[in-house]
């Protein structure tokens, strides 16, 4: 699968949610955990689309960062947009941005998250994923930033594993 190349647009996915009381905490603000579940689901869809197979097994390996900029309230409609930013051998970094204000031209960014998912075979072992061909300047910048985050993650993982041996 590694010899296949995909674009960011090939796996772009979106999801909209109308927020109900069951999604709210006691302050009337969207539960962070509920939002995380939706982010993880959308990231899985993006990853499967990048692999080109809706049956492809993928798993969340890392939630790199989740930044909540503004709260979301009951009756808000949130729009989540997910896209690939970087791919390794078997891993895919996915950015998801969440907006409110979907009925007007001035959407407000309320959340940005980076998740890393890994493609797995039927035995749970990592498998190669298609390469990513970033087309626009913004996609190329995101790719390079994702590459740097991947290097940092690998170094941190090696450090933790080495510490466990002591």
Regions found by a protein language model. Give the residues of each.
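Active-site helix/loop of acyl-thioester processing domains in fatty-acid/polyketide metabolism
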Residues: 34-54
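Active-site-flanking beta-strand signature of metal-NTP-handling nucleotidyl enzymes
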Residues: 14-18
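Short, ordered coil/turn segments that flank beta-strands lining enzyme active or ligand-binding pockets
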Residues: 22, 26, 122-123
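Small beta-barrel nucleic-acid-binding modules, principally OB-folds
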Residues: 54-74
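Short structured motifs
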Residues: 1-2, 62-68, 79-81
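HotDog/MaoC-like acyl-thioester-processing domains
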Residues: 2-9, 13, 73-77, 85-166
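A conserved, well-ordered hydrophobic junction motif at loop->secondary-structure transitions
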Residues: 24-37
């Amino acid at each position: 699968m590694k010899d296949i190349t995909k674009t960011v647009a090939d796996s772009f996915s979106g999801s909209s949610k109308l927020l109900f009381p069951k999604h709210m905490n006691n302050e009337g603000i969207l539960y962070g955990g509920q939002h995380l579940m939706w982010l993880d689901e959308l990231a899985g869809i993006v990853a499967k689309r990048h692999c080109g197979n809706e049956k492809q097994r993928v798993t969340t390996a890392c939630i790199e960062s989740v930044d909540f900029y503004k709260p979301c309230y009951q009756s808000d409609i949130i729009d989540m947009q997910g896209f690939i930013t970087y791919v390794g051998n078997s891993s895919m970094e996915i950015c998801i941005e969440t907006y409110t204000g979907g009925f007007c031209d001035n959407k407000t960014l309320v959340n940005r998250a980076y998740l890393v998912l890994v493609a797995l075979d039927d035995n749970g072992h990592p498998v190669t994923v298609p390469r990513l061909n970033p087309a626009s300047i913004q996609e190329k910048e995101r790719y390079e930033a994702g590459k740097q985050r991947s290097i940092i993650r690998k170094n941190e993982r090696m450090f933790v594993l080495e510490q466990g041996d002591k």
